[in-house]
Amino acid sequence: MAIFQIINESTPQVPKVKQSLNEKKWIQIGLEYKKAKAKGMTGKQFAEERGIKYSTFTSAMSKYASGIKTAEKIQKLESKPMNKLNKQERQLLMINSFRQTLRDKIRNEGAAINNKTRKWFAETIKQVKGHKVVRPQPGRIYAFAYDAKHKETLPYWDKFPLIIYLGLGKHNLMYGLNLHYIPPKARQQFLEELLKQYANTPTITNKTKLKIDWSQVKGFRGADQMIKAYIPGNIMGSLVEIAPKDWANVVLMPLQQFVSKGKRFSANKVWSNI
């Protein structure tokens, strides 16, 4: 199952993943104009009333027409009872909810450093909402520092995993999908597809989790690279459970630190086969 084909073929059109503040503003203005227009106000009157140059207003309405149309559709869907929505409408609401949590920019001044430390990791992870836990829950996302048991023989490994936790397996091993083993954009697409199919809530809330196991995700592109087993005793420090409303942000952060034979290993090389 090719996840990227699924997204292109079945996902309704939604606003761009990373809107600028200017775009968000214009989309809101566009929604207000549609209401005013329904009451008989012209575009020129609307623009003048708000102190906007008419040519600027018409240009923006044209440029963001698709985003305005989608936002209008979302508003209508949000007013409908959930049991009256079809599958496609529910998926649109979920993906819109997920993408609305994206921040305009995640500051990460340490992203380019070559040797990321546990201190760097601890400081960087504070940029997203999360809390320390002892017992992880399947279907949630966790970040932690890790010291691989077989680091001398592994071709490469990740010091700071970011996993969708699947549960405990044989020998008390923690199984999870380490999102760092695929590129940031692919992480977002992968997570969106899981949310559409397996989320336990219709929109992103603090209670959101993914009702999945390995059998449900093993066919997704990149899953065989992401699936990892972790020894609880080799986790350095605490597990940080990422709040669902920050999933969209944390998957785009360059937290990964791949290591091979004690030296930093290029993430691009890890992703080259995806």
Swiss-Prot record:
One of its GO terms (cellular component) is virion component. Keywords: DNA end degradation evasion by virus, Host-virus interaction, Inhibition of host innate immune response by virus, Viral immunoevasion, Virion. It is found in: Virion. Its main location: virion. The keyword Cell inner membrane does not apply. GO terms for biological process: symbiont-mediated evasion of DNA end degradation by host; symbiont-mediated suppression of host innate immune response. It comes from the Viruses. This is Terminal DNA protecting protein. It comes from Enterobacteria phage T4.
